[in-house]
Amino acid sequence: NSVFLRDNYTCRYCGNKLLSQKFIKSFIEKINSPLFTKGRTNLETTGLILLSWPVADHVIPWNLGGKTDLSNLVTSCAPCNYGKDGFTLEQLGLDNPFNKVVINTFWDGLDSKIKELKS
């Protein structure tokens, strides 16, 4: 969660604004619709969730020895995370996301709206 807060719930690769996992789970519970679900696999998960679900991505892939700490993790949307997979930035021709300035927009992934959503 500290990765998402540091990055303002914004994908460091594409710039997509993301929703907090807690908000998405509360929203799913509130609307209780089979059309808006988070399953165990991508096939069981609504596309809107995949687009807005934040993932802590290893800049240096874990399978290549990348650490699981704030110095190697950035916020990613699920599509960017899945697309990057276990490849390095160099292999994919991507800029280092740590070189991008994080602009504090005060976007909190709608965490501040969870209480309202539950009422």
How should these model regions be labeled?
Residues 90-98, 102-119:
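Intrinsically disordered, low-complexity, charge-dense segments enriched in Lys/Arg
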Residues 13-14, 79:
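Short, cysteine/histidine-rich loop/knuckle motifs that typically chelate Zn2+
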Residues 1-7, 65-70:
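Short, flexible, mixed-charge glycine/proline-rich loop motifs
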Residues 1-2, 8, 15-21, 114-118:
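A boundary/linker detector
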Residues 9-10, 55, 76:
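The −1 position to Zn-ligating cysteines in a subset of zinc-ribbon hairpins
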